[in-house]
Amino acid sequence: MASISAYGRESPLSHKTGYDWVAQAFSGIMHMTGDRDGPPLPVGIGIADVSSGVHAFSAIGYALFHRSRTGVGQWLDISMVDSMFHMHDVSLQGFTLTKGKFKPFRQGNHHELIAPFGVFKGPSGYICILSLQPQWKNICEALGQPDLEHNPRYADGPSRGENQGELIEIIEKWMTSFPDNDAVLE
């Protein structure tokens, strides 16, 4: 037997009705979605509904395997809120491991620690660019500014993160020199 509910059968909130957006809000996913200074936003798709179904599918597979080995069935209790917790990257873990000293926040279109790592305005829409240290040299060369690679303001990940606003301007200005997004991506 498998069941999916907002909070789980044995939760103190098991008698409450819940929907996708409620699970997103209750789990903190909405707190992490949206612009830094804006309100919390839901993810644009029914992620709690879908993720809970995927969790149930996976759990059913393991339960059937367990039953084939032991002859014992199980009751699988899938909570929509619980299925959202694995969606957090460092936000939940960072808060927990630092006993609340790390305060996760909405990042908007750019990662708060890594740059360039975000959604940039291109000439005919938006382009997602993600670059870690191994790719930084290639980004600088593509920008036509190889000197940025060793500029202390951008030489390593933490420096680029601290100077992210300037770096976003450099990249978006460069993108305007192309006729469209396809040309940027070539």
Q: Language-model segments: which ranges?
A:
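Aromatic-enriched alpha-helical interface/lid elements that frame and gate functional surfaces
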Residues: 108, 116-186
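Active-site-adjacent "lid/gating" segments in soluble enzymes
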Residues: 1-127
